[in-house]
Curated annotation (Swiss-Prot):
Record's subunit section: Part of the 50S ribosomal subunit.
Gene Ontology terms: cellular component: chloroplast; mitochondrial large ribosomal subunit
Protein name: Large ribosomal subunit protein uL16c
InterPro entries on file: Ribosomal_uL16, Ribosomal_uL16_bact-type, Ribosomal_uL16_CS, Ribosomal_uL16_dom, Ribosomal_uL16_sf
Family stated for the protein in its record: Belongs to the universal ribosomal protein uL16 family.
Record-level GO BP terms: mitochondrial translation
Keyword line: Chloroplast, Plastid, Ribonucleoprotein, Ribosomal protein
Length: 136
């Protein structure tokens, strides 16, 4: 599971997800990519599930790049706890993604294999996304 080695602060505010992604929205490494169409928090488990699905489908052929990293801690309060007495403890990590962000890139396989592998990974994600091909 992906998570930061260390952070300056244990807990963070939730924040807002306005606008579009201004960085990380172009294909940089591979030939095919999965691009997000909605804003969301994507958990480390979802990122790993998508990566595994793509790797398995491609039968370890080609190369896969994960373009996002979960660096935001999400806190959860214990069940049946009264209000007050501080913020809950960090439970899992999420990556904040805005529309236009590239999640995965892939190369070294045919387009049909890449399209199928990326669609399987897209089904693991909690949001709508689209397949991109690098125009040469």
């Amino acid at each position: 599971m992906l998570s930061p080695k260390r952070t300056r602060f244990r807990k963070q505010h939730r924040g807002r997800m306005n606008g579009k992604s201004c960085r990380g929205n172009h294909i940089c490494f591979g030939r095919y990519a999965l691009q997000v169409l909605e804003p969301a928090w994507i958990t480390a488990r979802q990122i790993e599930a998508g990566r595994r699905a793509m790797t398995r489908y491609a039968r370890r052929g080609g190369k896969i790049w994960v373009r996002i990293f979960p660096d935001k801690p999400v806190t959860i309060r214990p069940t049946e706890t009264r209000m007050g007495s501080g913020k809950g403890s960090p439970e899992y990590w999420v990556a904040v993604v805005k529309p236009g962000r590239i999640l995965y890139e892939m190369s070294g396989v045919s387009e049909t294999v890449a399209r199928a592998a990326i669609s399987i990974a897209a089904s693991k994600m909690p949001i709508r996304s689209q397949f991109l091909r690098l125009e040469i």
